[in-house]
Amino acid sequence: MTIMNEGKKRSHSSSSDDHLAKRQYVEHGNECIMADEDIDTAIFEDGIKNNMQWQDTISKVVKAVVSIHFAQVAPFDCDPALVSEATGFVVDSELGIILTNRHVVGAGPFVGYVVFDNHEECDVIPIYRDPVHDFGFLKFDPKKIKYTKIHALELKPSLAKVGSEIRVVGNDAGEKLSILAGFISRIDRNAPDYGELTYNDFNTEYIQAAASASGGSSGSPVVNVDGYAVALQAGGSTEASTDFFLPLDRILRALKCIQADQPITRGTIQTQWLLKPYDECKRLGLTPEHESTSRALFPDRIGLLVAETILREGPSDGKIKEGDILIAINGQRISTFIQVDDILDSNVGNNVEFTVQRGGTDINVTCTIGDLHAITPSKYVEVCGATFNELSYQMARFYALPIRGVFLSSASGSFNFDNKEKIGWIVDSVNYQDTPNLDAFVEVMKTIPDKSRVTVRYHHLTDQHSPNVTSIYIDRHWCSEFRIYERNDKTGIWDYTNVADPISEEPLKPHTAKFIPIPSTNPEIAKLSSSLCMVHTVAAIPIDSLSAETLKTSGLIIDAEQGYVIVSRRAVPHDCLDVFVTIADSIVIPATIEFLHPMQNYAIVKYDPNLVKAPVVTPKLSNRRMKRGESAQFIGYTHNNRLITSETSVTDISSVSIPSNLIPRYRATNLEAISIDSNISPRCNFGIMTDQDGTVRALWLSFLGERQENKEKVYLMGLDIMDCKNVINILKSGKKPQVHIIDAGFGSISILHARIRGVPEEWIQKMEAESNNRLQFITVSRVSYTEETVKLQTGDVILSVNDKLVTEMDQLSGIVHASDENIDSHVLHFKVVRDGKIVDLDMKTVQVDETDQIVIFAGCILQKPHHAVRQAMSDIPKGVYCTFRGESSPAIQYGISATNFITHVNEIPTPDLDKFLEVVRQIPDNTYCKIRMMTFDNVPFAISLKTNYHYFPTAELKKNKDTGKWIEKEYNNSQEIPK
């Protein structure tokens, strides 16, 4: 395929003057005509020669080309944290310098290695990334390359000409080596525009060709037939086969500075210029005199540079205006960006005179050349789970803003302003103190105690006219790090210093609050507003395959004296998080998690009632189950926290099966869900159903389902309060409840299907005689992993448990008891129909343990397989389970995926977290270890992984069983972090 394409392209160049000399001609009079046979022979011979020359060139070029495997390990400025591959090529074999793109080197922390053509691997560090132009340099140690002679490509920017045949040699589409052919079609196009809030090159010409390069080819050399690098592959069009190459003029200058150990000076007047053709310049006011002079001086040029964007408060602000046509600098006529760069870079700190034409008039202005490096951020702050840096020239240029302000490069943690917009925010003030720059921001954050709520004023770069004000929760316990990272171009590492330890939280004070009654003529219904509250959770660490996020819902206060609140487990999925209860939309109080039901989707949290001076009312809870057709009063909170109510009736009570997620995570199982006839309940993520006397009959809860198209599917259903009464009563008595369950999934089948499966007629008659709600049999839909020999099987039809006919799902919901009863398990006698025969089984119940320990290694979160994993798998490997991996971590770079089980490290079995920690703590920094794993489908495989403890230290979070608090401990870290 490649050869055919190259042949076609080469045939277009067979008419060059060099080839004409080799052709044979037959003369007819004064006319010179080429015979058909000679034409074919000449083209064929030229094609062979051209092909052989390219083959010889490519064989040398590939020895200089490297595949770059890298990670930009933290979000910084406009660059996200990511893991990717690209291309580079050696430009100095003695110093070990590799040229690639700036968007590969990145503006922030970089970790990577390169692979040479002979598959030798070598670590690289970044030594330079240009503030504007899309190039950067990596450095490797040439002494570590032992099995091949390092070949460097010579840079020849002057050889990039229109019509030149070129090859792009690189790591196209992630392949080890691809060779793409093309012809240079333009050498004077403006820099491509990649969109807002991302890196863009500007103030330079770009070279255009059609080579159809794709992802992974960034940083590839563009070579001519003589093997010289004439340009640098930088980007391409998504809608055509067009590629964009960066000229090498300024790259060559930067390389010479590095080779001479001299600083690479970069000057700026904070103005963006665009190359515009003469016809457009004339419309902007270019006079015929200047046009004729420029055309005479620069016959190959098609236009002049025109001012596009002038940054406020920059050196040219108020002097140069948009639409000004650049005529000369210091009296030197200008036609290219290269001339501008050369003058500015040589005059940092000096005054330079610019001659521009505005409306047909020549205007001379003097600007002091600024230092481009000084307005390019080289440090960032990490605090409260978010990262910040000074607003950069890159970001400010797009919106013509002054280069100042605190730029939120990762909207997460306490500063997660908008789940949909993660980049582009400017923090104007925190806790009523202005934050004009990063240093001021750091000083403000030093003074704020942990778990405080402070006011933040901020705005988005794309909307300067709409300031935002919100209150945020300061998290310095889950996200305890407060660090300043600074770039070190000598080592390639971003060194960090710890700024300040967390300030202890301030003691809470009690507050008063007033409840607004529910609009109702029934006083018993109206006062139920005093029994409802808001609940929100802040999860900073993703565990149990659940995201780190903030969730909000409502809850029912089931005991005002002790502060118990029942809430959907959708909002309280586990206990590695912070919980808050808001009373009367006025008082926010921290709460503790007292109970998580393993199947029925509810949690119970507890707040300190001494902090609430408000008439909170404990509601009456029903002692009887709801039935189909019953009337009820629905009271619920809408998504915007408005309390609404309406009369309704129960339309159905049936077993439901919530779809499982692709990656197993908590979901409700074995439910008898209540459906109601109401047009307002779909608008409420929490509510209650009551009798007319205010007795609570059921809860209206949100249930987490599967993830579809990157969105969470949430189901809304009712849960009878009777399903919660035993747990509530145990908590009210001052004890801790425990639930023992038969760990299997159940569903329902009709009498017809039960008969087909072999259920005897006598049992069908019993069901018809005793069932009052729905004629159904309960069947086993799936069986969780267990090491017990006696167990249910999928397809079993449940007849009875302990000699009692099973007619409804709640009979299989588990056994609830107080924790002080010390019951390891119960044995239940099941009678089932299996394969058409009645079978008696003595089944042990199990207690579902919540996650109480996690290990963070190489950027992935490891834990014991949680309950959802055991529900989904029939055979669980002996290893630690990966539940999450960081977006720029070694785990992603080397191939650890969520749902993988790590069974061995360096051939040592790791059956549990303690053994895993024992093994990995012996692995030195920046070394490879062998990891054997098992996929979710029990397919074994192995990888090698290189540790990086500077950016990804090993840590453990473990729950103290006595206090209920999570304790963090870091291991083998390159720097100690005070706790």
UniProtKB/Swiss-Prot annotation:
Keyword ATP-binding attributed: no
EC number: 3.4.21.-
Active site: 103, 134, 217
Entry GO terms, CC: nucleus
A Pfam family hit: PDZ_1
UniProt GO molecular function: serine-type endopeptidase activity
Xref: InterPro entries: PDZ, PDZ-like_dom, PDZ_6, PDZ_sf, Peptidase_S1_PA, Peptidase_S1C
Domain spans labelled PDZ: 273-361, 750-836
Cysteine pairs bridged by disulfides in the record: none
Predominant place of localization: nucleus
Residue segments, region Serine protease: 65-255
Biological process, per Gene Ontology: apoptotic process; cellular response to heat; lipid metabolic process; stress-induced homeostatically regulated protein degradation pathway
Cellular compartments annotated: Nucleus
Annotated segments matching region Disordered: 1-20
Job of this protein: Nuclear serine protease which mediates apoptosis.
Family statement: Belongs to the peptidase S1C family.
Protein name, per record: Pro-apoptotic serine protease NMA111
